UniProtKB/Swiss-Prot annotation:
Single GO molecular function: glutathione binding
Annotated glutathione binding sites: K51, V52, E64, S65
Pathway named in the protein's UniProt entry: Secondary metabolite biosynthesis
GO cellular component: cytoplasm
Highest taxon, organism lineage: Eukaryota
Family, per entry: Belongs to the GST superfamily.
EC number: 2.5.1.18
The keyword Transferase appears for this protein: yes
GO biological process, one term: glutathione metabolic process
Name of the protein described by the UniProt record: Glutathione S-transferase hmp2
Domain GST C-terminal: residue ranges: 88-212
Amino acid sequence: MVIKLYGSAMSTARVLVTLLEKELPYEHILVDISKGDQNKEEYLKLQPFGKVPVLDDNGFIMYESRAICRYLARKYDSGTKLIPDVDDHEAYGRFEQGCSIEYSYFAAAAETLGTELVIKKYKGLGEPDMTRVAQAEADFDKVFFEYDKILAKQKYLTGDEISLVDLFHLPNASALKAFGYQGTFEKYPNVNRWFSGLQARETWIKATAEAR
């Protein structure tokens, strides 16, 4: 059976790019958040928290985008190798460390900026908290400062081969570039080279076109 991916817009982009890198056939099923599809009883049977995306792999149901990507990378040998072998302890340790940094430091800062500067305005939730914005901008800059040192020595964040750690950054970092933070990327030449390369990958171009 073909893998089914439930979601809407950019919520599915992280999983889509992983499916495309792994060269896996899939069916993309729209969940229209604007119409409240995520709160319907049928969908809540798949994702009890009412969030997107959800993966159905021949009856095996998973949610949370990063967990889905890890599952796909571990299960399927096709396409790009995106996760190290668990018996390569140092490589796997670097991989898990990179995943944790992306989620705890980078995504946390990026999502705070998105909430304060975009979502609040869109949903009519008042003015942005500029104290939170300033702290998130400082945190974002710190991550790129450290990344630039790493990327001066290697092509990707965990070595010279691409991994999920790199792909995990694509949705939030692309949004930051689009919403006025291009200068932060350009401030760090190794980061800018790395991320420009990620955005130019055919799989990401296809994923973003499909996720719109």
